[in-house]
Swiss-Prot record:
GO molecular function: protein-containing complex binding; receptor tyrosine kinase binding; signaling adaptor activity
Family the UniProt entry places it in: Belongs to the CRK family.
Span of domain SH2: 14-112
UniProt keyword Repeat, yes or no: yes
Residue span of region Disordered: 179-217
Assembly mode: Interacts with ced-5 (via C-terminus which contains a candidate SH3-binding, proline-rich region). Forms a ternary complex with ced-5 and ced-12. Interacts (via SH-2 domain) with src-1 (when activated and phosphorylated at 'Tyr-416').
Record's protein name: Cell death abnormality protein 2
Keyword terms: Phagocytosis, Repeat, SH2 domain, SH3 domain
Gene behind the chain: ced-2
GO cellular component: cytoplasm
Low complexity bias locations: 182-206
Amino acid sequence: MNMNGFDPFEWRSFYFPGMSREDAHKLLGEPRVSIGTFLMRDSSQPGEYSLSVREADEGNTVCHYLIVRDVKEDGTAGVKIAEQSFPDIPALLNHFKMRVLTEASLLSAYKKPIIEVVVGTFKFTGERETDLPFEQGERLEILSKTNNDWWEARNALGTTGLVPANYVQVQSGEFANERISKGTSQSSIGSSGNGAERFSSTSTSSENAEAHPTLPTTAKVTFDRVPNAYDPTQLRVKKGQTVRVLEKMSNGMYRAELDGQIGSVPFTYIRFNTANQ
C-alpha cells in the first residue's frame, strides 16, 4: 500500500487541466487542507505543467512549481523542475515524496471529486493505454463524463482511466449516496461547495461542449503520446502541437493528421480549438 497517500504513476487522477493558478491557490489555501497536499495543472506557459503544493499553515502558504519539457542532446525527452531533471512525471513526483520542495514534501494528492458511482454490467478488458479494465459487478467512481460514450473513472485501488458508458450502470441507493458524499467532502475539504465541485462541473461542461465538433477541424494536443512502435495506425503526438482532426472513429478515438502523417488519437489527448467551431 502506498503509505504517502498517492501513486505517482496515477498522476492524471490529480491533474486539473483547466485550473488556473489563482483557483489552485484558493483551493489548497483552505485552512483545513493539510501540509503536503498537492495537485497538478496546466501552466500559463503553453505546453507546460505546474505543481501546486500546500507547504505551510502560517499564512496558508501555497507554492507553485513550473514543470517544463527537457530534451537532451541525444534526443531523449524528460521533464525538469527548477534545475533538476527527471525521465518523466512519475519519477519527479516520487522524488519529492521523500525530499522537501521549499518547506514540505509531497504527502497527499488532491483527488478529483466523485460525481457518480456505477457498477460494471459487463467485463471490460480495455483496448488502449488510457482505458480502465474492470470486472462485471465491480464498483467504479465516475470523475467526469467527457462525452456520451466514454467516462473517466476510478477503481478501488485508485487507478483511473476511461470506461465505456454502455458497460456500466449507475449505482443507486444508500451506498452510492454515501460514496459520493465522502468523495465530495474529501475533495472540497470543507470549502462549502466552492472547491473542487465547482472546478469539476466547469471542466465537464467544457468537455461536453467539445465532444461533437464539426469535422474536419483543428485541436491542441494536451498530453505527450508515444504509441506502440509496431502499431502504424496510431499517431505520435507531443503536448502543445496542433493536429487536424479528420473524423471520429467507432471506438471513440479520432483520426487525425500531423505533418503529413495520419493516425488515431484518444480524445483525452486533444482539446478542440473552440474558435474553429
